[in-house]
């Protein structure tokens, strides 16, 4: 096995987002334990840059990395890939070269398009940690986020309700707006005793601008009327392949609209 993570956290023996624990260093304060560690992390709207230090041997190696994917969670993913390659004796320089051209995968901060200064982004985020990471990444390049979330499944929504509320409460800014569609129902005899209305009600109590939207047609109208230059419309949800189609509908709708410059 090979330990990896962020140098700032490893040097003080703390944990990184996602729950990775790092051993205390035996070489004194600020020293790194054996592993791969990211330093000088800079996340920007179109990607990330950082340096990976290989502290697995006496002769440490340090390589600069650039990603075309924003967000600290993608830096963590790159570290995991580098650690895997390191175990297979692939040089870090080769890993950096490969990741520099990596465009990402479908429905992970997937930029559908931009019109009138408004971006439409599609993402698979569906649990609290992924929602938090995705929102943090999108906010790097946005003056405001218009987040659209479709919870997936009644049982998962029931189970994660409080954590979902916490994720949105801690990540959304006062000027951001959350539009919540009804829970995605894939059929079956599942107990349907919770609704997106319940989540929205609790979010509103916390002072968030959260809106329940029962139909996508109504949401298209709201986004047409409310979007302005500098906004990012972020559509999140899992298991429903039509969400990507809906992103394209949003983009087409905005292209036929004169966007407001203020609100």
Feature-to-residue mapping (PLM):
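Conserved phosphate-binding catalytic cores of ATP/NTP-utilizing and phosphoryl-transfer enzymes
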Residues: 33-36, 74
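Nucleotide/phosphate-binding loop and acidic/charged catalytic motifs
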Residues: 77
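Short, acidic/turn-prone active-site loops that include or flank metal/cofactor-
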Residues: 5-9
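ATP-dependent carboxylate-amine ligase
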Residues: 10-13, 17-34, 46, 60, ...
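Acidic-glycine-rich active-site phosphate/pyrophosphate-binding loop
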Residues: 13, 40-61
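A short glycine-threonine-serine/GTX helix/turn-capping micro-motif
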Residues: 63-72
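Active-site regions of enzymes building and remodeling cell-envelope glycoconjugates
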Residues: 1-3
């Amino acid at each position: 096995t090979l330990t990896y993570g962020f140098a700032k956290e490893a040097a003080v023996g703390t944990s990184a987002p996602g729950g990775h624990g790092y051993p205390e260093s035996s070489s004194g304060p600020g020293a790194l334990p054996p592993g791969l560690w990211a330093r000088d992390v800079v996340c920007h709207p179109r990607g990330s840059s950082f340096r990976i230090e290989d502290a697995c041997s006496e002769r440490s190696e340090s390589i600069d990395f650039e990603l075309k994917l924003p967000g600290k969670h993608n830096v963590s993913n790159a570290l995991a890939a580098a650690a895997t390659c390191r175990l297979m004796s692939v040089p870090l320089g080769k890993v950096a070269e490969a990741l520099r051209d990596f465009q990402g995968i479908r429905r992970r901060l997937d930029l559908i398009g931009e019109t009138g200064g408004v971006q439409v982004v599609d993402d698979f985020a569906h649990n609290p940690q992924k929602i938090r990471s995705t929102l943090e990444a999108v906010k790097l390049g946005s003056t405001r986020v218009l987040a659209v979330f479709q919870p997936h499944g009644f049982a998962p929504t029931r189970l994660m309700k409080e954590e979902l509320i916490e994720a949105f409460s801690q990540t959304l800014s006062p000027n951001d707006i959350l539009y919540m569609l009804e829970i995605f129902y894939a059929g079956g005899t599942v107990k349907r005793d919770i609704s997106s209305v319940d989540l929205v009600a609790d979010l509103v109590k916390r002072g968030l601008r959260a809106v329940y939207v029962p139909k996508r047609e109504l949401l298209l109208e709201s986004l047409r009327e409310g979007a302005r230059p500098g906004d990012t419309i972020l559509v999140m949800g899992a298991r429903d392949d039509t969400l990507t189609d809906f992103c394209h509908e949003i983009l087409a709708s905005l292209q036929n609209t004169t966007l407001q410059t203020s609100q």
